């Protein structure tokens, strides 16, 4: 990480750096856009561009100062067409009072005043400049500043503040939105001091698959309560009622069972059965009687 240009009180804590690394916010793509080159730390041998997380932290603080400078939080619009960022923008809006657009951005939201969903925000924040290109394009028509989470291959046209980070991973997106919300609340004074811990865990900003959660709930409902305890108790009681030290005579001698099985010689004539009799025709019947009469020519 490059030397920080921030005042000492704004420097990130070791826990913040560990969270950024654990969420893989520093891993970019293999493509590099020319305007994102100043935020590049190095390129790995496999071609993956590594982002300087020191620059990421500086841009998070810059974006938080811009957001905190707006008097009415409802004039801030947070947008995410990418599924991994929809939960994060909804939580960000709930904690900071911003307006969230999660999902498809309806064309004309910022330019067509006839539509019912028309908005006039003073600032928009997007999760991905590529998937939210329509919102950025309309913001450029009406002079709305844009803050965007930009990867190494993201287009930066009409983006005023780019936060360099991995904007494709669910954990990276959720963590950046969580850090941004925390810094905004600190600057607004909602959190008393910078040493005060925020009681909202970062997991609330992570994307969760609705189908996976629904299947998990169904599995929990169909599970019979106490079935495992009953089965375990029955097995334990069965084991307790047996004496494992008592063995059958000769059980400890190798080959005893095989010798007992082969002690009596096997005789195929012992049963007294007649193999020829079983194939004989029933009494009173002859092959001549059963065969049809031959035709006389």
From Swiss-Prot:
Comp. bias regions, Low complexity: 263-289
UniProt keyword annotation of Ribosomal protein present: yes
Gene designation per UniProt: rps0
Annotated signal sequence range: none
Summary of the function given for this chain in its UniProt record: Required for the assembly and/or stability of the 40S ribosomal subunit. Required for the processing of the 20S rRNA-precursor to mature 18S rRNA in a late step of the maturation of 40S ribosomal subunits.
UniProt key word Ubl conjugation: no
GO CC term (a single one): cytosolic small ribosomal subunit
Domain of life of the organism encoding this protein: Eukaryota
Location within or outside the cell: Cytoplasm
One annotated GO molecular function: structural constituent of ribosome
Keywords linked to the UniProt accession: Cytoplasm, Ribonucleoprotein, Ribosomal protein
Name of the protein described by the UniProt record: Small ribosomal subunit protein uS2
UniProt subunit comment: Component of the small ribosomal subunit. Mature ribosomes consist of a small (40S) and a large (60S) subunit. The 40S subunit contains about 33 different proteins and 1 molecule of RNA (18S). The 60S subunit contains about 49 different proteins and 3 molecules of RNA (25S, 5.8S and 5S). Interacts with rps21.
PANTHER family cross-referenced by the UniProt entry: 40S RIBOSOMAL PROTEIN SA
Classification via InterPro entries: Ribosomal_uS2, Ribosomal_uS2_C, Ribosomal_uS2_CS, Ribosomal_uS2_euk, Ribosomal_uS2_euk/arc, Ribosomal_uS2_flav_dom_sf
Family (UniProt): Belongs to the universal ribosomal protein uS2 family.
